[in-house]
Amino acid sequence: LCRWNAIDPLAEKYCSLSGYAYCGNNPVRFIDPYGLTIAEGSLQEFGRLRQTIRDKLNSWIALKQQYINAFYAQGNSGEPNTSYFDMMIQSLQRSLALMDIIEMSTHTYKLNFSEGSKGTLKHTPNTRYFTLTYGNDALFVHELTHAGQLENGEIGFTKAGKNALMIDIYDEAAAYAAQYAFSPESVEGLNPSVYIYSMADITAEWVIGIEDATGGHPYGPGGSNHTGQALLNINSTWNEYLGAYHSERRSIREQYGNWGDTPMKDVMENVFNDGFIW
């Protein structure tokens, strides 16, 4: 039986609710990590974004049907190639499924629209509280994908850290592919060397070729985004981590030592006195 030893400091704000109805009597939908407020603002924006993704999904379904109708109207036989539409539809369906997953998560997610932002997923140190910041709806889909990777253990955060660890070029490729399914034009020109004809063109190699305003490659080896160049997840070992940061491995080893095949989770907890959140 849970008990509180003080009155909720914001009890008057929710006078329409019973003083005994924790989280509005709906602790699955509402989470109160600090005992101060129910984050309804994010839920309203979350609902808007969910409907926007549904609308995009329905648009692609309609376009696919138009394509099929036109194919047969021209007297063609057999099955039309709908792979382009199928990839877009399946990706948007995955994005909607991810929204359900993070809504039910043990983590708390706050949405933060910031005009001009390129998008981030940040952790509030020493909590299970995460903020998705995005400058437009397409970037929300990108960061939503990273939140899903957190839920799946593909990336992780330390308890005291703000930024993701174990994030690699394959994680970024998945996020950009989801972003493309929502808004193809939002990723056009990011990699000036490769023209994107379909979602299948967004690969790890494409991510490495993305250029920033200075002509640099933020996702490449030694890039400003500090992205792993090989597949990583929270179960990766120290050696696998070094392999993903090959261009930096000497400096990393000199600074932190050589931990061989020790799992990164153990390295963080035992060496840096910090654990993973995933």
Describe each region flagged by the PLM:
Residues 1-3, 25-27, 150, 180-185:
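Glycine-rich, acidic and aromatic/proline-enriched surface loops and short helix-turn segments
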